[in-house]
Amino acid sequence: MAKLTKRARLIAEKVEATKLYSVEEAVALLSELSTVKFKESIDVSVNLGVDPRKSDQVVRGSTVLPHGAGKDVRVAVFAQGANAEAAKEAGADVVGFEDLAEQVKAGNLDFDVVIASPDAMRIVGQLGQVLGPRGLMPNPKVGTVTPDVATAVRNAKAGQARYRTDKNGIIHAAVGSIEFAADAIRGNLEALLTDLRRAKPASSKGVYLRKVTLSSTMGPGLQIDLGALNSTK
């Protein structure tokens, strides 16, 4: 049998596999178990009572995190005229139209979020093979195709969790960093869960929010006690 690393032994000693943790307990334990030299994110996985094989049960959207995401977000905006100026004033890092499309085609993708005004989609639509695989393709369902590009930029800069159910009906999102206080993680998590409840498909039957798990980038997953969350009541 292979020897456990010091970190693996610590996790095995500290984590109770069957326990339902409060957010505060989970954040404290993940912080205690964090031994890496970079700032880990705090991630959440939410198992939803949906059938992802059915198109009307795909849950997709975004949540503005009230306490931010804990990282700097670089935003690119496809817009022209007044929209371009509004995007710049709102803090966009890169703003352009055909010129920005050429940068993308050349592989210059030094940004985390792409926003587009509706009139720019005739150009952005041609970039699907580049932006799509990187999760950067603008989409109206998550608020990144919008006539109000300034608000979209401010939301992205403030910190947003974007999500879409995977093939198993699970949502994955970051809700902060390991340096956040527990109440900030709780606030972000409850904002996300509130939006997920609002996005419940009409055809979804039975229990909708089935399981919530918090983890850090390199840490274990800790199941959260749903009964202790205001957004699940």
UniProtKB/Swiss-Prot annotation:
Give the top-rank taxon of the lineage listed in the UniProt record for this protein.
Answer: Bacteria
Annotated GO MF terms: rRNA binding; structural constituent of ribosome; tRNA binding
Coiled-coil blocks: none
Among InterPro entries, the record links this protein to: Ribosom_uL1_bac-type, Ribosomal_uL1, Ribosomal_uL1-like, Ribosomal_uL1/biogenesis, Ribosomal_uL1_3-a/b-sand, Ribosomal_uL1_CS
Give Gene Ontology CC terms.
cytosolic large ribosomal subunit
Record keyword RNA-binding present: yes
Mention one GO biological process in which this protein takes part, according to its record: translation
Instruction: List UniProt keywords, sorted A-Z.
Output: Repressor, Ribonucleoprotein, Ribosomal protein, RNA-binding, rRNA-binding, Translation regulation, tRNA-binding
Matching CDD domains: Ribosomal_L1 (cd00403)
Describe the subunit structure: Part of the 50S ribosomal subunit.
Q: What does this protein do?
A: Binds directly to 23S rRNA. The L1 stalk is quite mobile in the ribosome, and is involved in E site tRNA release.
Q: Which family does it belong to?
A: Belongs to the universal ribosomal protein uL1 family.
Name under which the protein is recorded: Large ribosomal subunit protein uL1
Species annotation: Marinomonas sp. (strain MWYL1)
